[in-house]
């Protein structure tokens, strides 16, 4: 029985609730418990059997499958490092004393089951995959992949001085591997397997039994435990059904847990080795919820408010109260810096990554500020002397905490200060030279209007009480200790922060020289308050205004498939907004009540990290109901449909209140503009595929009438304000949506609309210095637009734009590259025809290399059939290639053709073009425009063709027949005509044998010279004499 089947066959119902224990680890006086919910709890087990919950770690969203503890020492800090692994492959490294998540690592290969410490430098991860990942402990990075396993590997403890590492497998075999630790390479030395009964099942674990005898180990099968010596010699066995785990006690007693019982066995050596049953305890023992604690077997059960420790051999039950876990702290203040979100709660402060939160719905904190206690009322990061970033946190009780930012999203605690003011609502940092020697000043403003000043050495300088008036403005002078304080009752005070004196001040012109405004907080100005993202807490909703430029710069859309397209279908099937069918009252699936369409708002990012929908009176999380609904899907959906909401009559105020994401440079009238056009222009095909799938499925859910209204709305923007193409971002956004809808649903448009739109974009691409945006818009729906414009003009503009942006031709995420790819996918034959005819003839010779580069990209992305494509090559492209043979880009074109169509090739001088046509080899002599066909048919399917450098020999490989065929090109002299004619004959056939008949065999000609070639098919490498 394998681990997956064992997990699914467990009878206990606690697993389904996510509360049950999924892994346990003991280290010194600590007991670390991982749960199916992903939570990790750390208990301090004292000598009097008293359990104390000292820490909880929350980062995993899947069952914690394995835990390892290591001593940690760095920068004078001595701590315990706890490394946790969940089934999804997420690795987290925690520091116990500081509660810091020091590092994370994500594996994506299968179900990860076990974390194993190989030595002081390396950890190993095994699971339901045929490899072992090696992770260097010092930098927490994958440094090697141990392959060569034919079954799921099982690692178990071995002697440190051993030169060979044993690895067990489910069939009972054990391989001994030698390791070169410098090169991190592995070599299998020997394989052993004990002769055991096949009824025992499969091996699920190996437990060393050195306390019983040297070189002994218990092999845990699904239905028996077997004691082996040296992993090979059978000693004794004991049969039990549905075994889940086995532990060996210090006295040599084996404790065996099954799904329904716990059994204690003792091994006796005489008269012959056998196991003796000592005792048996019945009961449901959850999978992996049992361990050996203080040399005694114990089972753990977790409930919402407590965890129980059942001592099986003693019959006693201890418990530990978990009330601290059920106290959910409310968010009292939110603050952002770049893509980090700081949430001040009623019990402390934590920092999250907006990048992870927004894109992955992963609310795991990056850092916890454990020194901060009490209700956080204000915080801010300041740049002080020597460019140090200092985070200042204030609480309701009047305490201030100072942290310095370190590398790797870490913070160093500096100090804590008790202020004379309470309920701090504002902190200001003034850079000025004081007579005390400090170069800066922190000013804390209280709810009652009082002020407190500290210098940059965190010394309390002065306190200024208030009679209830609120501060409106502070005026600071660089070289004086005085600060002018202006109140809302028109009072002005001159406050000397060093001498702790205060006098009445007078307004004068000098006051205007420098000031810091701390006036009323203006919500409408939120995106411009800070350089980056910012956050606001209103009505228990954390509103995050995200700088989309920073977000996209931190993405790598080409390599990260973080959204499956099936998720889009599930998400759209779940959330169909009622405003799309405004004439029909719909009962909302979340709240179960009928509501007015104008009350719908979008929210992303509650304090718990869930995406939400917000209404005028209530908000509801949809993550639990729709598990594949991510914040990114929510945002993409509403970015497409928000203009329709506006068209339906939603007011600016209500809609702006519900939209959480804005660009920092947008005006209030541009609230409906999304990040869509920016992401589309700065992302690869993965992200663009997500957007297209999202829009395609959205259009399927919209009735024809609603779609017409949507198209009409976007046309309204673009036709009425088309002259302000570069002044209004909303026009660009409308054009992006229209061009995408054209590519997905052209039948929804009138012919007049398509003509107008395509002509408009073509004119913009010409008049705006071959504008990339207009070119990108035309490429979105090229298959449709090309019917209403002269495609040669557009392609001419495309080439001129390529000339201006040659570097973009090598950037797969650039606007230009994506435009060429989309046009190629849509109609590569038309693109190449235009390039070879109209465009190539109009260009000067120094521009033809750019055209050839575009040609190679078009060929690489074509989806045309070879028969149609081959006619274009012979009639249009070959003369151009032959005349430009000295240009380097010609070889890019020939390589692209050979890559896209492996059964076609060129010689090194680009004088002969060859291809396979229904078993016949055809050689086209480019200069003479003459076609030569082989005299004999190959009578097999040739997948790969390659020519010798001179074009005299051709090698073809057939994977189906496992055969290699060699043709010779020669000139036959005819005497009575006194001339020579070319001929193609099969010189030899070579049968290639592979080691395995069922392996996937993809043929390949690795290299070819004038006299020989190397062919690879399946597991065979053959060097052939031509």
UniProtKB/Swiss-Prot annotation:
GO terms for molecular function: dynein complex binding; microtubule plus-end binding. WD repeats lie at residues 14-53, 62-104, 148-187, 937-977. It is found in: Cytoplasm; Nucleus. One of its GO terms (biological process) is establishment of mitotic spindle orientation. GO terms for cellular component: cytoplasmic microtubule; cytosol; kinetochore; microtubule associated complex; nuclear envelope; nucleus. InterPro entries: WD40/YVTN_repeat-like_dom_sf, WD40_repeat_dom_sf. Signal peptide: none annotated. Its main location: cytoplasm. Keywords: Cytoplasm, Nucleus, Repeat, WD repeat. This is Uncharacterized WD repeat-containing protein C16H5.13. It comes from Schizosaccharomyces pombe (strain 972 / ATCC 24843) (Fission yeast). It comes from the Eukaryota. Coiled coil: none annotated.
């Amino acid at each position: 029985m394998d681990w997956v089947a064992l997990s699914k066959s467990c009878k206990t119902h606690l697993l389904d609730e996510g509360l049950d224990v999924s892994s346990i680890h003991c280290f010194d006086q600590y007991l670390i418990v991982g749960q199916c919910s992903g939570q990790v709890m750390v208990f301090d087990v004292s000598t009097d059997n008293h359990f104390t919950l000292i820490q909880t770690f929350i980062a995993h969203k899947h069952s914690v499958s394995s835990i390892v503890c290591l001593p940690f020492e760095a920068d004078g800090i001595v701590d315990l490092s706890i490394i946790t692994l969940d089934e999804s492959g997420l690795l987290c490294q925690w520091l116990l004393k500081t509660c810091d998540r020091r590092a994370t690592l994500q594996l994506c290969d299968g179900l990860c089951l076990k974390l194993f410490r190989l030595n002081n430098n390396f950890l190993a991860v095994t699971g339901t995959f045929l490899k072992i990942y090696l992770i260097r402990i010092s930098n927490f990075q994958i440094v090697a992949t141990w392959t060569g396993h034919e079954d799921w590997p099982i690692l178990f403890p071995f002697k440190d001085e051993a030169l060979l590492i044993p690895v067990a497998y489910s069939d009972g075999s054990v391989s001994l591997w030698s390791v070169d630790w410098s090169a991190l390479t592995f070599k299998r030395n020997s394989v052993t397997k004990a002769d055991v009964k096949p009824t025992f099942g499969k091996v699920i674990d190996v437990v060393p039994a050195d306390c019983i005898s040297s070189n002994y180990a218990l092999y845990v099968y699904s239905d028996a435990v077997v004691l082996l010596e040296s992993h090979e010699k059978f000693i004794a066995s004991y049969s039990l059904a549905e075994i889940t785990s086995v532990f060996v006690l210090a006295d040599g007693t084996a404790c065996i847990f099954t799904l329904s019982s716990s059994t204690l066995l003792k091994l006796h050596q005489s008269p012959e080795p056998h196991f003796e049953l000592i005792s048996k305890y019945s009961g449901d023992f959850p999978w992996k919820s049992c361990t050996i604690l203080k040399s005694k077997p114990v089972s753990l059960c977790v409930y919402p408010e407590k965890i129980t420790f059942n001592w099986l051999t003693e019959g006693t039950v201890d418990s530990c109260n978990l009330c601290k876990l059920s106290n959910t702290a409310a968010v009292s203040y939110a603050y952002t810096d770049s893509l980090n979100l700081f949430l001040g709660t009623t019990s402390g402060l934590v920092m999250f990554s907006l990048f992870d939160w927004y894109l992955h719905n992963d609310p795991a904190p990056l850092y916890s500020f454990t020194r901060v206690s009490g209700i956080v009322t204000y915080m801010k990061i300041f740049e002080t002397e020597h460019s140090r970033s200092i985070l200042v946190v204030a609480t309701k009780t009047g305490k201030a905490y100072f942290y310095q930012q370190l590398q790797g999203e870490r913070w160093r605690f500096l100090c804590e200060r008790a202020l004379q003011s309470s309920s701090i609502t504002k902190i200001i940092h003034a850079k000025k030279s004081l007579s005390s020697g400090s170069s800066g000043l922190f000013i804390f403003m209280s709810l009652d209007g009082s002020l407190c000043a500290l210098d940059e050495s965190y010394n309390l300088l002065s306190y200024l009480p208030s009679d209830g008036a609120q501060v409106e403005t502070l005026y600071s002078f660089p070289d004086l200790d005085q600060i002018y304080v202006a109140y809302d009752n028109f009072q002005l005070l001159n406050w000397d922060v060093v001498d702790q004196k205060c006098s009445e001040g007078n307004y004068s012109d000098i006051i205007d020289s420098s000031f810091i405004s701390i006036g009323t907080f203006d919500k409408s100005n939120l995106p411009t308050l800070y350089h980056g993202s910012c956050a606001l807490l209103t009505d228990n909703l954390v509103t995050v205004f995200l700088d989309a430029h920073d977000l996209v710069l931190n993405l790598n859309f080409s390599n990260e498939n973080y959204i499956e397209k099936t998720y889009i279908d599930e998400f759209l099937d779940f959330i169909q907004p009622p405003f799309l069918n405004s004439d029909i009252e719909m009962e909302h699936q979340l709240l179960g009540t009928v509501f007015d369409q104008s009350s719908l708002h979008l929210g992303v990012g509650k304090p718990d990290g869930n995406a939400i929908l917000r209404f005028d009176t209530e908000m509801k999380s949809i993550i639990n109901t729709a598990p594949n609904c991510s914040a990114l899907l929510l945002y993409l959906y509403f970015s497409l449909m928000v203009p329709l909401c506006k068209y339906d009559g939603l007011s600016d105020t209500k809609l702006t209140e519900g939209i959480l994401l804005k660009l920092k440079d947008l005006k209030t009238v541009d609230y409906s503009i999304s990040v869509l056009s920016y992401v589309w222009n700065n992302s690869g095909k993965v992200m663009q595929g997500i957007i297209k799938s999202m829009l395609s499925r959205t259009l399927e859910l919209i009735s024809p009438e609603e779609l017409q209204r949507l198209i009409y709305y976007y046309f309204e923007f673009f036709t009425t304000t088309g002259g302000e193409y570069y002044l209004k971002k909303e026009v660009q956004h409308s054009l992006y949506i229209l061009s995408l809808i054209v590519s997905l649903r052209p039948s929804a448009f009138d012919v007049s609309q398509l003509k107008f739109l395509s002509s408009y974009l073509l004119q913009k691409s010409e008049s705006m210095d071959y504008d990339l945006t207009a070119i990108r818009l035309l490429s979105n729906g090229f298959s449709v637009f090309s019917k209403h414009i002269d495609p040669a003009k557009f392609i001419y503009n495309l080439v001129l734009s390529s000339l201006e942006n040659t570097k973009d031709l090598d950037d797969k995420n650039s606007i230009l590259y994506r435009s060429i790819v989309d046009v190629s996918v849509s109609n590569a034959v038309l693109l190449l025809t235009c390039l070879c005819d109209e465009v190539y003839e109009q260009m000067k010779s120094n521009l033809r290399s750019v055209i050839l580069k575009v040609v190679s990209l078009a060929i690489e992305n074509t989806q045309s059939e070879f028969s149609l494509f081959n006619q274009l090559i012979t009639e249009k492209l070959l003369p151009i290639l032959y005349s430009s043979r000295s240009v380097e880009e010609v070889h890019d074109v020939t390589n692209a053709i050979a890559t896209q169509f492996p059964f076609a090739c060129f010689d090194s001088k680009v004088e002969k073009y060859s291809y396979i046509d229904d078993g016949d080899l055809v050689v086209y002599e480019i200069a003479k425009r003459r076609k030569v066909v082989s005299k004999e048919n190959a009578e097999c399917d040739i997948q790969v063709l390659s020519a010798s450098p001179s074009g005299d020999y051709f090698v073809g490989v057939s994977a189906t027949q496992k055969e290699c065929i060699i043709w010779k090109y020669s000139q036959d002299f005819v005497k009575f005509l006194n001339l020579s004619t070319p001929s193609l004959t099969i010189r030899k056939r070579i049968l290639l044998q592979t080691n395995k008949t069922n392996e996937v065999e993809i043929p390949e000609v690795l290299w070819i010279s004038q006299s020989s070639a190397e062919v690879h098919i399946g597991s065979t490498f053959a060097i052939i004499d031509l």
